[in-house]
Amino acid sequence: MFRSRSWFGGGWNRPKNRLSLDHLKYLYSVLERNTTVSENNRGLLVESLRSIAEILIWGDQNDSSVFDFFLEKNMLSYFLHIMRQKSGGSSFVCVQLLQTLNILFENIRNETSLYYLLSNNLVNSIIVHKFDFSDEDVMGYYILFLKTLSLKLNTHTIHFFYNEHTNDFPLYTEAIKFFNHPESMVRIAVRTITLNVYKVQNPNMLQFIRDKTAAPYFSNLVWFIGKHILELDACVRNDTE
């Protein structure tokens, strides 16, 4: 009975200081003991992920050892492992994972911490992960995550997202797949992402966009705008008749 309770992160060894390296170590042990998502542990995992984001944001400004531990244990790989599961409750946990990632990247201020987070390519693996976009919450937090990442783009960080050797740019190519999404907030986010990308002065990246994506994306964008102009024209004509 006691082992079962401990397995799901019983509170006996939980550090009293919520924002501390010790608490992050405790939460890491929770992830280690709950590598498979189930209906029984999904609530625990969601709460752990939420707390991890809070500790990392605090550590970014107050204690560099927090990020050192997060990177040493490669905790982003645990996030990706959870995302790739199809077990019961995994979609529910995916929503929290995307929330956690969005909060983390939105609030991180230390450039070194940001570079460390982006350096092992796990963020790109998360971007190309096949999420269940039929879930509105997953769709919403995914596109918000991409938008948050796009706000971090500059001449230095672009190299973490655009790979010149493989000529690949997942942040951009995955985002523009949703340019014509039925939800207006998703479409607006996609426009914001593309504009944030175009602002970065990287010749090879801009050449990639022109060669690989410009024709299908901009032709579809023009068609989309034209379609709405015709619909507006029809509405005006009906009102005047």
Write out the residue ranges for each language-model feature:
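Elongated alpha-helical scaffolds that mediate protein-protein interactions in large eukaryotic proteins
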Residues: 2-174, 178-241
